[in-house]
């Protein structure tokens, strides 16, 4: 009988398609369909920052975040001081205007929140959390993940990056309705310079703040432009090898856009291992031209690049070919 090999041949295109779709999903990160880069506190365009999400409590926006996988959002730990009732939280994806989310937007309930256990309070290290959604979202032109960097990616001082959010435009004002997503280009500031800035003009009732090793500064010494209240947990992204990679998570600052007080972010690369422990299937963006590897739980080396799904499909094809030879 030759019928088994016919069934196997019918499975072949399905296996090839599965591998191709996996590779396409991985390539989706950091590649929005819309490009329009203007410097300085401007309205974003629809689909321009498709990983930006609004984290809401009882239907009200209180923090930003970034989609990093179909069921996971990266944000700040200080956004979740109390998670005893997880049912009050939801995530809004694919929206440009908070008050008028539009047809491309999607509300998804929160399943659980995992804060970094090393986090000890405002302005401390490890101010990162992972929000798991109730179910996976389908990637569209308006809902796409941002790439996360592995430790090989260095964000140099002076590098121009972007911060986005629905936070207040200043310490006194609230973003006017319909609350359009804002974008701002900010340069990276090296840690020694940032510490010097935060040591200037220190008021007597303020505790001196230190930029820790897992923190990253971005902004302007003269102030005037910065993230503000309501932006917390949102992404600081930089263009690396033609992909948008998240360098930091909005964490803290003194006021908003004050002189000598640039924004402080948590370095994503500093918490690469913790993120990978919770989401082992998540792949990280390495430097161009390098083949990044990670060890699985058994200590075996495995590829961490976009070729993995293709290699898996290739292996299945070889196995299927061997099966056909045995059958015929």
Swiss-Prot record:
Cellular localisation: Secreted
Q: Does the keyword Secreted apply?
A: yes
Domain Peptidase S1 positions: 38-280
Leader peptide range in chain numbering: 1-22
Q: Which UniProt keywords apply?
A: Disulfide bond, Glycoprotein, Hydrolase, Protease, Secreted, Serine protease, Signal, Zymogen
Gene3D superfamilies linked to this entry: Trypsin-like serine proteases (2.40.10.10)
Write down the SMART domains for this protein, in alphabetical order: Tryp_SPc (SM00020)
Q: Which CDD domains match?
A: Tryp_SPc
Q: Which Pfam families match?
A: Trypsin (PF00089)
Primary location group: secreted
Q: Which domain of life is it from?
A: Eukaryota
What protein name is recorded for this chain? Serine protease 27
């Amino acid at each position: 009988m030759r019928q088994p090999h016919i069934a196997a041949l019918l499975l072949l295109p399905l296996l090839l398609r599965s591998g191709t779709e996996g590779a396409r999903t991985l390539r989706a990160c950091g590649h929005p369909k819309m490009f329009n880069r203007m410097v300085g506190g401007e309205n974003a365009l629809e689909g321009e920052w498709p990983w930006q999400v609004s984290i809401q409590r009882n239907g009200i926006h209180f923090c930003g975040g970034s989609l990093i996988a179909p069921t996971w959002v990266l944000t700040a730990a200080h956004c979740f001081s109390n998670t005893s009732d997880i049912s009050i939280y939801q995530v809004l994806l694919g929206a440009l205007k908070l008050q008028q989310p539009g047809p491309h937007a999607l509300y998804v309930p929160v399943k659980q929140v995992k804060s970094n256990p090393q986090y000890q309070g405002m302005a401390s290290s490890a101010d990162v959390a992972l929000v798991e959604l109730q179910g996976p979202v389908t990637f569209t032109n308006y809902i796409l993940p941002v790439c996360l960097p592995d430790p090989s990616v260095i964000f140099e001082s002076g590098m121009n990056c972007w911060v986005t959010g629905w936070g207040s435009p200043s310490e006194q004002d609230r973003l006017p309705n319909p609350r359009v997503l804002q974008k701002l280009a900010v340069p990276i500031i090296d840690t020694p310079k940032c510490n010097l800035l935060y040591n200037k003009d220190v008021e007597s009732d303020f505790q001196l703040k230190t930029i820790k090793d897992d923190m990253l500064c971005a902004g302007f010494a003269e102030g005037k432009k910065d993230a503000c209240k309501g932006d917390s947990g949102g992404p600081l992204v930089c263009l690396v090898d033609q992909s948008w990679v998240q360098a930091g998570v909005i964490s803290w600052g003194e006021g908003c856009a004050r002189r000598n007080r640039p924004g402080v972010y948590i370095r994503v690369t500093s918490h690469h291992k913790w993120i990978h422990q919770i989401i082992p299937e998540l792949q990280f963006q390495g430097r161009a031209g390098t083949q990044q590897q990670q060890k699985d739980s058994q200590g075996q080396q495995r590829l961490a690049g976009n070729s993995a799904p293709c290699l898996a499909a290739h292996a299945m094809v070889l196995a299927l070919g061997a099966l056909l030879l045995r059958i015929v």
